[in-house]
Amino acid sequence: MPTKKTSRKGIPKNQARKTRNTRTDPLIKGKRFPKKKNGWIRICVWGNAFERGYAHGVLLSKELLEIREKILPFLVKTFYQIPYEQYEKDCHDQLYDTIRTEYPEFFEELSGIAAGASSSTGKTISIDFILAWNADLSMSNMYKSKKHPSKDERCSAFIAVGDATETGEIIMAHNTHSDFVSANTFNIVLEIIPNKGDGKKIKMQTAPGFIASGSDWFLCENGIIGCETTIGGTNYKPDFSGGQTPYFCRIRQAMQYGESLDDFVRIMQKGNAGDYACSWLLGDTRKKEIMLFELGLKTSNIERKTNGVFYGMNKAISPEIREKETEPKSANGFWDMNETSGARNIRLHFLLYEKYYGKINLSNAQTILSDHYDVSTNEETRGNGLTICRHANLEDRITASPRGAFYPWGCTDGKVVSSSMAKRWSFLGRWGPTCGHVFSAKDFLEKHLQFKNWSSVLPNMGGNPWARL
């Protein structure tokens, strides 16, 4: 704990002078911790919207420059198969005026990120790039086709409370499933402290330049904690007409200004563009209540519990959402053990409702997220495309790896938290596959020459221990 005189929430008044850019930005309202913690980069920003954004941009300027010059253009070319310039223009045309009008605070923060990164690097990093990067998940379904599916099937997660857990408190757990290139940017733990009167502070896993989490793992000062799993196979494209707004602005609004689970629902439903359909798993640590909130385009599902479990595996729990808003293949595969979401559904149901019900704690939450049991073969594996800790890069079955055999996609992190940890403003995180598996880009590319065009961006991953963050 700090011993020197502090301002709000324990941040030293002279903290700004301890950033890595003190010579150019002596009054920056932010701090980057000097060393990574088991692979995680930790930063804190505070002040008004532009000040927070500016500090964010300065502190993560090196990472943002790499995303602008290499990573985002690669992702757009690989997954959307359009020129990057077209993608950035599409984002501007669809979202720029809407965000500026509907969310002026967040527009200021985005502008600050661009200004801070430009100042720190000496290169132009535009707000259009920052917007296009934030909008990656929102725009994914715009370009979905049989040749390049959207970035769904992204996570495994659960939340439990009451008689389902060892102590009765809330336990929440989540791992991200993603392509290894974009996933490698999500090692940021960002704390945001707004000025008094501008909402509550937030702590979240995120990527450089993002104003919301993106991986969607967050703690809120008001006692709300949350995560989500994407609803895969949606049968519609987002609608940003008529003032409909992107999900990353709505969820940030909910995190910063929502006071209750009801507020989260209201804020997320208002202006919903259907751009990133999710099964949200939310908990109120003050009331010991959890909620499943599934939001598609026109259909939603809300369930609450003070005893029990909710989990997500990239299919809607709601039969109505599956029937109305997902493609037949996705809707019909809810319990299909040969398909990734169906297989994880079967395994999560067994682990959460049979093996660990009444005993769920932080330790076995980590075990569940690391699980490599393949229900289609009834055997333990080293991990594959069907397991909770997913490894599509080790998979040659097309039903288990729909993007193709040995695709560099899978589990890239793990996070767990309890109510008591959240109240102490911390969680446990593992950077890299939840199981601890080490991924060597060099070894992978030597074995799988079809991915040689990934060589300039594919990272090494894994091998880090869990960290308290």
Residue spans for each PLM region:
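Arg/Lys-rich, intrinsically disordered low-complexity tails that mediate electrostatic binding
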Residues: 1-22
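C-terminus-biased signal that marks the final domain/tail of proteins
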Residues: 21-157, 163-167, 181, 195-198, ...
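Active-site rim segments in enzyme catalytic domains, especially the processed small/beta chain
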Residues: 166-259, 266, 322
